[in-house]
Amino acid sequence: MTSVYSIEYQMVIKALREARVAGHITQEELGKALGRPQSFIAKVENGERRLDIVEFVHLCRLVGIDPVSIINKV
């Protein structure tokens, strides 16, 4: 199925997921650190839920990447 989100947004989500996996962080662990259920992370990564800017910054920090570096790539 084709995503309803732009290529740029998909790149952002891909970078977040890759950083999470590279850091050996599970969806469960990331969700808990964010105060959300694992399903929240799964929905974000699968394109079922869109992040707002505050959630994006929090996720970047939790997976150890600089939000500005991701934005500069878009």
PLM feature spans:
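A detector for short, charged/polar N-terminal pre-domain segments
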Residues: M1-M11
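Short amphipathic helical patch at the helix-1/turn junction of helix-turn-helix
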Residues: Q10, V21-A22, R50
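Short basic helix-loop element that most often maps to the first helix and adjoining turn
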Residues: K14-A33
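Key DNA-contact positions within bacterial/archaeal DNA-binding proteins
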Residues: E28, S39, V68
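Recognition helix of helix-turn-helix/homeodomain-like DNA-binding domains
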Residues: L34-L51
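DNA major-groove recognition helix of helix-turn-helix/homeodomain DNA-binding modules
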Residues: V54-S69
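Phosphate-coordinating loops and pocket residues in cytosolic domains that bind phosphorylated ligands
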Residues: N72-K73
